Amino acid sequence: MTKGILGRKVGMTQIFTKNGILVPVTVIEATPNVVLQVKTNESDGYEAVQVGYQDMREVLSNKPAKGHAAKAKTSPKRFIREIRDVELKDYEVGSEITVDSFSEGDVVDVTGTTRGHGTQGNIKRWGQSRGPETHGSRYHRIPGSMGSIINRVPKGKKLPGHMGGKKVTVQNLVIEKVVPEKNVLLVKGNVPGAKNSLIFVKSAAKAAK
């Protein structure tokens, strides 16, 4: 069954395994998430657990959000997500999900929003090669010809534009260490997003059986 938790990206560091191998890891701080709602087939048409992360100031909330959080005997949350394919009997409204639900060696998928780079050209955005610098060349960093046949820009054409700021999931990352007293997960490798950005960690969908 799927496990999941919301947290924030602290940054990257490195640790040594028992065999003395240096492993780069991402530090994810995941303070306890609160179960706001348990959805069932009878009431909602599908099964899921709704969790909330990070308290929201009362002045920024509204009455529906306050009422929804009050059912779980908690304050309104800034971030709310759903986790599907879970064992519903393991969750109760108002209970907490902590990093203890994961263990070392678990394979997870990590979702975050990539860092925004603003408007960028083809070389930075798509990794295209640049043209000659000298000998009368007028082709340096421009995209180049798109052809003269179809008289339109084909869908998906790689052109300059906004780079980054997209939701990305990195699959099959390994949890190297769990630090319950600090609410921290150490995940092998890098994950999308800037420091302090929202991160969603859940059991891998395509992990080797």
From Swiss-Prot:
A GO BP entry: translation
Entry's Gene Ontology molecular function annotations: rRNA binding; structural constituent of ribosome
Gene3D superfamilies: 3.30.160.810, Translation factors
Keyword terms, alphabetized: Ribonucleoprotein, Ribosomal protein, RNA-binding, rRNA-binding
Annotated InterPro entries: Ribosomal_uL3, Ribosomal_uL3_bac/org-type, Ribosomal_uL3_CS, Transl_B-barrel_sf
Similarity comment text for this entry: Belongs to the universal ribosomal protein uL3 family.
Protein name as catalogued: Large ribosomal subunit protein uL3
Species name: Lactobacillus gasseri (strain ATCC 33323 / DSM 20243 / BCRC 14619 / CIP 102991 / JCM 1131 / KCTC 3163 / NCIMB 11718 / NCTC 13722 / AM63)
Name of the gene encoding the protein in the UniProt record: rplC
